[in-house]
A protein has these predicted regions:
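Signature of the catalytic double-stranded beta-helix
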Residues: 20, 24, 44-89
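Short beta-strand segments
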Residues: 8-10, 91, 120-122, 165, ...
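Acidic, glycine-rich loop-and-strand cores that form catalytic or ligand-binding grooves
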Residues: 83-84, 90-94, 116-117, 128-129
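Histidine-centered active-site/metal-ligand motif
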Residues: 6, 104, 174
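PAPS-dependent sulfotransferase catalytic core
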Residues: 43-55, 121, 189-196
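Catalytic core of Fe(II)/2-oxoglutarate
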Residues: 98-99, 109-117, 127-238
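N-terminal auxiliary "cap/dimerization" subdomain that precedes the catalytic jelly-roll/cupin core
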Residues: 1-42, 66, 217-238
């Protein structure tokens, strides 16, 4: 697959379940969101189980179940997988107008479990989304010489009840680098879950996402310093 292993799964949930999940999202302006608002990203997220309404709680439980992980194994052929019950980096995600997420590599080591993060599952949950607003996940190839993203290869359009599952260990650059242009009051809603494998001995440990600057940011020293500071800060937490 180009640029790395990924699977797009439409009609992921029964449509009535998908609609109910979308309706259970908190209001975007509710104060308990964690707001990532910096030169690299503009999104809100929540991953606390105690805040999930009943159906959302049940769905995250199912997506982390042995039964569902067996389904993931059948789709991907990856045999050794563990759930991330703590939803580290997962849970609810929301983007408003102007929301974005620079192209990046996910962290590859779960800091609590010391397992390799192997697969990322994202399900889009905004009905009646116009794809001209953006919001589709972009998958980019890897430039071996610069060790940076090379070019956009795939855009997985933000279509209601569509899931994308992808391998995060293959220099899997991805993101939403172009600010979303949806109307005010419309939001890109998604849920995310990650699956892990045993840690290979030769793994280059990265416990925090590694971001790349956009083309417009490539010569912006403040942005480049911010990217370095994120990595340095995390390395001090080991």
């Amino acid at each position: 697959m180009i640029p790395y292993d990924h699977w797009v799964l439409d009609d992921f949930f029964p449509v009535d379940v998908a609609r109910r999940l979308a309706n259970e999202f908190p209001d975007y302006n509710e104060p308990n969101w964690h707001w990532y608002n910096n030169p690299l990203e503009n999104k809100k997220a929540k991953n606390h189980w105690y805040e999930f309404p009943q159906l959302t709680y049940q769905i995250f439980s199912h997506l982390n179940s042995t039964e569902f992980i067996e389904t993931i194994r059948e789709i991907t052929g990856i045999q050794t997988q563990y759930p991330d019950i703590g939803l580290h980096g997962g849970g609810w995600h929301m983007h408003s107008r102007g929301g974005k997420l620079n192209i990046h590599l996910d962290y590859n080591i779960n800091p609590k479990l010391n397992l390799q993060r192997k697969l990322n599952l994202i399900v889009y949950l905004t009905e009646d989304w116009d794809t001209s607003w953006g919001g589709g996940l972009e998958l980019w190839s890897h430039n071996e010489e610069t060790n940076l993203p090379d070019k956009r290869e795939v855009v997985v359009d933000n279509i209601f009840n569509r899931a994308i599952l992808f391998d995060t260990t293959q220099n899997s650059w991805h993101g939403l680098p172009q600010p979303i242009t949806c109307p005010e009051g419309t939001y890109r809603k998604s849920i995310a879950v990650y699956y892990m494998t045993d840690l290979p001995e030769d793994t280059n440990q990265r416990k925090r996402a590694l971001y790349a600057p956009t083309k417009e940011q490539a010569n912006d020293s403040e942005v480049l310093d911010f990217i370095k500071e994120r990595v340095t800060w995390k390395s001090k937490q080991k």
